[in-house]
Amino acid sequence: MKFAMPMVKDFVPKAVRPWLYVVMALCFQVSAARYLGALNEIIGATSQMREDVLMCLYCNLAGMALWFPMLFRMKFRFTNKTLLVAASLTVLVTNLLIGYVTWLPLLWLLCFIEGIAKIQGTFECMSNSQLWMTPKRDMTIFFPLLHIVILTSMNLQDFMSAYFGMLGDWRLMHWFVAGVH
């Protein structure tokens, strides 16, 4: 049986379809609650303590961890398009708000929600391209490729946030991620 992605429109070339999902997974993974590459700029601009900013990251991680058991339930309940659009819109809205919200409980809630959308979008993209990566569902091939996507985006987001901070404002990274989504 040949690998196919029926959820993608016919005008998209078949060779490009799985790569679109890998790029979308990278985009979801680049999104974050706060960016450590711009940590000092965030602390200086918002007058928050380092622990407050790190708590944003912990809330993002908690959102991903608590939503993980729900991923397959969501995948089997909703369509691919619905899940990707919802996750993308959530990442877009939360990234636009996170840069400007100063009340910490609301900021932590937004970071938690952004973590849920981040893991949902990444899971949807990577589970759709899994059979393309390894037609026999060999997890010894799939998980290293998944880790390459995750680690690449982690390094990329720190570099990009430091660069955007150098260009002018640490919020540029949030605007960039919102624009990508």
PLM-predicted stretches and their roles:
Residues 16-58, 66-71, 122:
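Extracytoplasmic
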